[in-house]
């Protein structure tokens, strides 16, 4: 009888060990959903998720909440960090006596326990925030300025849109940085439906009218506007954004007869990674 009882107990323990915890994965809303917060839902990231690197894309007057892009992340790796009771460190040293400013372009090393299921995802259960003095690069802030300048010129092209697409695929930004810039740009102008598609993809997915080769009409996006930044290639066939000077073209497109262009734009960064103002070689309208 004792042997039978012991065998039953072992089977019960094995059954318990075989269960998979349903909170074992990081959850985030899909980029294309456009949904806001999904209250009350979190998923654990796992103990090994601590100390991950994120780049600040946008801050509110140098303070939290921060919009972050996970370093070398995918389109869904866009997050926010709200004020916490955790005292940040600077390269591992205390910042108690410092007047901290969170500057876009700065790298943060963040240890956290879970992510709220929203888009952008909200980092939660944060136990450590380490501000890195190395790796600074605020090219995302540069391209946000370019996009906002494009928005402001010939504003009739985008004054009545309900959606937009931002194509940064031909820049040196990571997928997560591209998605974060697009989301921030749309939010600044009250556009909740933000895509990251190029012209061909918009046409293929049916957003454009008159784009079919057999159509007699003129290509047009009736409800939206496409914003594109394209870095020019260097002689070795690499995008020159990886260097200290970048040359690029930028445009917004509503239709074949409704577009605005910045061409041969140039910008440079200093030794600390700060990108300065850019110059426009020429502007054109169609």
Residue ranges and their predicted role:
Residues 113-119:
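Short, charged beta-turn/beta-strand-edge "cap" motif at the junction between a beta-strand
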Residues 18, 24, 28-35, 40-44, ...:
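Flexible low-complexity loop/turn motifs enriched in small/helix-breaking residues
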Residues 262-286:
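Short beta-strand edge/turn micro-motifs at domain boundaries
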Residues 46-53, 259-263:
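Short coil-to-beta-strand transition motifs
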Residues 95-102:
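Short, surface-exposed secondary-structure edge patches
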Residues 13-16:
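C-terminal motif of bacterial Sec signal peptides marking the signal peptidase cleavage site
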Residues 1-8:
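Positively charged n-region of N-terminal signal peptides that target proteins for export
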